[in-house]
Amino acid sequence: KYEYIYSICGISPNDIPQSEQELWKSIDEIIQIVKEKNSKKLVAIGEIGLDYYWNKENSDLQKQAFIKQIELANEMKLPIVIHSRDASVDTIDIIRNHRVKKVGIFHCCQLNQELVRQALELGYYISFAGPITFKNSKNAPDVVKMVPLDRILIETDSPYLSPEPNRGKRNDCRNVKYVAQKIADIKEISLEEVAKKTYENAMRIFEI
Protein backbone atom coordinates (compact mmCIF):
# COMPACT_ATOMS: atom_id res chain seq x y z
CA LYS A 1 0.00 0.00 0.00
CA TYR A 2 2.81 2.43 0.89
CA GLU A 3 5.78 2.53 -1.47
CA TYR A 4 8.23 3.60 1.23
CA ILE A 5 7.39 0.83 3.74
CA TYR A 6 9.26 -2.49 3.61
CA SER A 7 9.15 -5.54 5.86
CA ILE A 8 11.38 -8.09 7.54
CA CYS A 9 10.13 -11.38 8.96
CA GLY A 10 11.48 -13.69 11.64
CA ILE A 11 11.14 -15.09 15.15
CA SER A 12 12.85 -12.95 17.77
CA PRO A 13 14.75 -14.80 20.50
CA ASN A 14 12.36 -13.19 22.97
CA ASP A 15 9.41 -14.91 21.26
CA ILE A 16 10.79 -18.44 21.16
CA PRO A 17 8.14 -21.06 22.10
CA GLN A 18 8.65 -23.11 25.25
CA SER A 19 8.99 -26.50 23.57
CA GLU A 20 10.90 -27.86 20.60
CA GLN A 21 7.66 -29.05 19.00
CA GLU A 22 6.14 -25.56 19.22
CA LEU A 23 9.37 -24.04 17.92
CA TRP A 24 9.39 -26.12 14.76
CA LYS A 25 5.73 -25.34 14.19
CA SER A 26 6.54 -21.62 14.43
CA ILE A 27 9.56 -22.03 12.14
CA ASP A 28 7.40 -23.80 9.55
CA GLU A 29 4.91 -20.94 9.72
CA ILE A 30 7.67 -18.38 9.17
CA ILE A 31 9.03 -20.35 6.22
CA GLN A 32 5.56 -20.49 4.68
CA ILE A 33 5.00 -16.76 5.19
CA VAL A 34 8.38 -15.82 3.74
CA LYS A 35 8.03 -18.04 0.68
CA GLU A 36 4.45 -16.99 -0.01
CA LYS A 37 5.07 -13.29 0.50
CA ASN A 38 8.52 -13.16 -1.09
CA SER A 39 8.73 -9.95 -3.06
CA LYS A 40 10.78 -6.79 -3.22
CA LYS A 41 8.86 -5.65 -0.14
CA LEU A 42 10.41 -8.38 2.02
CA VAL A 43 14.00 -7.25 2.44
CA ALA A 44 15.47 -9.33 5.30
CA ILE A 45 14.97 -12.15 7.79
CA GLY A 46 14.84 -10.81 11.33
CA GLU A 47 15.09 -9.89 13.92
CA ILE A 48 16.71 -13.18 14.83
CA GLY A 49 19.49 -14.15 17.20
CA LEU A 50 20.13 -14.76 20.89
CA ASP A 51 19.04 -13.00 24.07
CA TYR A 52 20.45 -14.31 27.34
CA TYR A 53 19.48 -11.23 29.32
CA TRP A 54 15.83 -12.21 29.61
CA ASN A 55 16.05 -15.97 29.35
CA LYS A 56 19.17 -18.12 29.13
CA GLU A 57 17.34 -21.31 30.15
CA ASN A 58 16.06 -21.81 26.60
CA SER A 59 19.39 -21.01 24.95
CA ASP A 60 19.39 -24.31 23.02
CA LEU A 61 16.01 -23.50 21.47
CA GLN A 62 17.20 -19.97 20.68
CA LYS A 63 20.23 -21.37 18.88
CA GLN A 64 18.12 -23.83 16.89
CA ALA A 65 15.77 -21.06 15.79
CA PHE A 66 18.67 -18.77 14.90
CA ILE A 67 20.41 -21.39 12.77
CA LYS A 68 17.24 -22.47 10.99
CA GLN A 69 16.38 -18.88 10.10
CA ILE A 70 19.92 -18.27 8.82
CA GLU A 71 19.35 -21.25 6.52
CA LEU A 72 16.07 -19.68 5.38
CA ALA A 73 17.82 -16.36 4.70
CA ASN A 74 20.47 -18.16 2.66
CA GLU A 75 17.82 -19.99 0.67
CA MET A 76 15.91 -16.76 -0.03
CA LYS A 77 19.12 -14.78 -0.65
CA LEU A 78 18.23 -12.23 2.01
CA PRO A 79 20.33 -10.50 4.68
CA ILE A 80 19.65 -11.12 8.36
CA VAL A 81 18.90 -8.62 11.11
CA ILE A 82 20.51 -9.83 14.33
CA HIS A 83 19.35 -9.32 17.90
CA SER A 84 22.16 -10.14 20.33
CA ARG A 85 21.97 -9.32 24.02
CA ASP A 86 24.43 -10.72 26.56
CA ALA A 87 25.16 -13.46 24.02
CA SER A 88 27.93 -12.04 21.87
CA VAL A 89 30.24 -15.09 21.94
CA ASP A 90 27.54 -17.56 20.85
CA THR A 91 26.14 -15.11 18.30
CA ILE A 92 29.50 -14.63 16.60
CA ASP A 93 30.23 -18.38 16.72
CA ILE A 94 26.96 -19.19 14.97
CA ILE A 95 27.32 -16.65 12.16
CA ARG A 96 30.94 -17.76 11.63
CA ASN A 97 30.10 -21.46 11.56
CA HIS A 98 26.92 -21.30 9.51
CA ARG A 99 28.19 -19.16 6.67
CA VAL A 100 25.60 -16.47 6.26
CA LYS A 101 25.68 -15.77 2.53
CA LYS A 102 24.63 -12.12 2.72
CA VAL A 103 26.04 -9.66 5.21
CA GLY A 104 23.47 -8.44 7.68
CA ILE A 105 22.88 -5.96 10.46
CA PHE A 106 23.47 -6.02 14.19
CA HIS A 107 20.28 -4.25 15.24
CA CYS A 108 20.11 -1.90 18.23
CA CYS A 109 23.71 -2.81 18.80
CA GLN A 110 24.91 -3.36 22.34
CA LEU A 111 27.77 -0.96 23.05
CA ASN A 112 30.28 -3.79 23.23
CA GLN A 113 33.54 -2.96 21.47
CA GLU A 114 34.65 -6.57 20.99
CA LEU A 115 31.30 -7.60 19.51
CA VAL A 116 31.36 -4.61 17.15
CA ARG A 117 34.96 -5.33 16.12
CA GLN A 118 34.15 -8.93 15.21
CA ALA A 119 30.91 -7.96 13.47
CA LEU A 120 32.78 -5.44 11.31
CA GLU A 121 35.45 -8.04 10.47
CA LEU A 122 32.67 -10.31 9.20
CA GLY A 123 31.28 -7.52 7.00
CA TYR A 124 28.21 -6.65 9.06
CA TYR A 125 26.54 -3.29 9.41
CA ILE A 126 25.99 -1.80 12.86
CA SER A 127 22.65 -0.17 13.69
CA PHE A 128 22.57 2.32 16.54
CA ALA A 129 19.50 3.34 18.54
CA GLY A 130 18.57 5.45 21.57
CA PRO A 131 21.13 4.00 24.01
CA ILE A 132 23.99 5.90 22.37
CA THR A 133 22.34 9.12 23.62
CA PHE A 134 21.99 7.97 27.23
CA LYS A 135 24.08 9.88 29.74
CA ASN A 136 25.26 6.64 31.36
CA SER A 137 26.45 5.16 28.04
CA LYS A 138 30.05 6.11 28.72
CA ASN A 139 31.52 3.90 26.00
CA ALA A 140 29.14 5.07 23.24
CA PRO A 141 31.62 7.55 21.71
CA ASP A 142 34.35 4.91 21.42
CA VAL A 143 32.00 2.38 19.83
CA VAL A 144 30.53 4.88 17.36
CA LYS A 145 33.99 6.11 16.39
CA MET A 146 35.19 2.60 15.56
CA VAL A 147 32.40 2.01 13.01
CA PRO A 148 33.01 3.53 9.54
CA LEU A 149 30.19 5.78 8.39
CA ASP A 150 29.50 3.51 5.42
CA ARG A 151 28.67 0.65 7.82
CA ILE A 152 26.28 2.54 10.12
CA LEU A 153 22.50 2.38 10.21
CA ILE A 154 20.16 4.20 12.59
CA GLU A 155 16.89 3.15 14.19
CA THR A 156 14.60 3.73 17.16
CA ASP A 157 13.60 0.20 18.27
CA SER A 158 10.19 1.72 18.97
CA PRO A 159 8.27 1.73 21.21
CA TYR A 160 11.26 1.12 23.52
CA LEU A 161 14.55 2.88 24.26
CA SER A 162 13.52 6.47 23.60
CA PRO A 163 16.63 8.59 23.14
CA GLU A 164 17.48 11.66 25.15
CA PRO A 165 15.75 14.09 25.54
CA ASN A 166 12.68 11.82 25.52
CA ARG A 167 14.02 8.95 27.60
CA GLY A 168 11.28 7.26 29.62
CA LYS A 169 8.56 8.16 27.14
CA ARG A 170 7.03 5.98 24.44
CA ASN A 171 9.37 5.90 21.47
CA ASP A 172 8.43 6.43 17.83
CA CYS A 173 10.18 6.83 14.49
CA ARG A 174 10.40 10.62 14.77
CA ASN A 175 13.04 10.21 17.47
CA VAL A 176 15.57 8.74 15.04
CA LYS A 177 16.81 12.31 14.47
CA TYR A 178 18.32 12.30 17.98
CA VAL A 179 20.27 9.14 17.22
CA ALA A 180 21.53 10.67 13.98
CA GLN A 181 22.51 13.88 15.74
CA LYS A 182 24.47 11.97 18.38
CA ILE A 183 26.45 10.16 15.69
CA ALA A 184 27.10 13.49 13.96
CA ASP A 185 28.34 15.00 17.22
CA ILE A 186 30.64 12.07 18.00
CA LYS A 187 32.11 11.91 14.50
CA GLU A 188 32.20 15.71 14.20
CA ILE A 189 30.32 15.79 10.92
CA SER A 190 27.02 17.31 9.84
CA LEU A 191 23.62 15.82 10.57
CA GLU A 192 22.96 15.98 6.83
CA GLU A 193 25.97 13.77 6.10
CA VAL A 194 24.82 11.18 8.64
CA ALA A 195 21.32 11.20 7.15
CA LYS A 196 22.64 10.84 3.61
CA LYS A 197 25.08 8.03 4.37
CA THR A 198 22.74 5.98 6.56
CA TYR A 199 20.04 6.28 3.88
CA GLU A 200 22.49 5.03 1.25
CA ASN A 201 23.61 2.22 3.55
CA ALA A 202 20.03 1.06 4.13
CA MET A 203 19.27 1.12 0.41
CA ARG A 204 22.40 -0.92 -0.27
CA ILE A 205 22.00 -3.58 2.43
CA PHE A 206 18.29 -4.09 1.68
CA GLU A 207 18.78 -3.77 -2.10
CA ILE A 208 15.95 -1.28 -2.41
Where are these regions (language model features)?
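Mid-domain alpha/beta scaffold segments of enzyme catalytic cores
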Residues: 1-208
